[in-house]
């Protein structure tokens, strides 16, 4: 089931910035305990191995905005690839089209990037696409359709957006290129992907 509540509340519960900018913990939003009646008790307790795996799985799942069913399907795909499993997991997640649209600075969140793709505002290699979960490759080109670039809100955001180092973006042309797979050091440090791998290795055959 996909989580539809407040991303700020979810981030505080997980103790991790799902927006990757710590806005959820900025002054006026941070609280002394995680949401819920027993927040302090759960925060102070030592997590079991199972609970640690669950927490890391949830952090990764909610950050990339995918359901558990989608994650299992993606994990099966990653299991078939050669190389380091944890590295490949992050590479595949980062290579989703909605994530690349976000990394190129075309959308403030992955959720809004998914909406852009769903509504047909994104062109991949000269083809209009509407599937956010498409896995793209280094060298692929992404462009926004003209109708959405006319929005003052979109234009203003893109002009001031931060672009990830593993993509190139031409803000004036509203287009970009996925240059290379990201290094682990360029990705969120607050997730222990080894726990995520252990979680899904039990469930996915």
UniProtKB/Swiss-Prot annotation:
Key words, A-Z: Ribonucleoprotein, Ribosomal protein, RNA-binding, rRNA-binding
Statement: the UniProt record of this protein carries the keyword Thylakoid: no
Keyword RNA-binding: yes
SMART domains given in the database record: Ribosomal_S4, S4
Domain S4 RNA-binding: 95-158
InterPro entries referenced in this protein's UniProt entry, alphabetically: Ribosomal_uS4 (IPR022801), Ribosomal_uS4_bac-type (IPR005709), Ribosomal_uS4_CS (IPR018079), Ribosomal_uS4_N (IPR001912), S4_RNA-bd (IPR002942), S4_RNA-bd_sf (IPR036986)
GO MF assignments: rRNA binding; structural constituent of ribosome
SUPFAM superfamilies reported in the protein's UniProt record: Alpha-L RNA-binding motif
Transmembrane segments: none
GO cellular component, one term: small ribosomal subunit
Family recorded in the similarity comment: Belongs to the universal ribosomal protein uS4 family.
Record-given protein name: Small ribosomal subunit protein uS4
Gene coding for it: rpsD
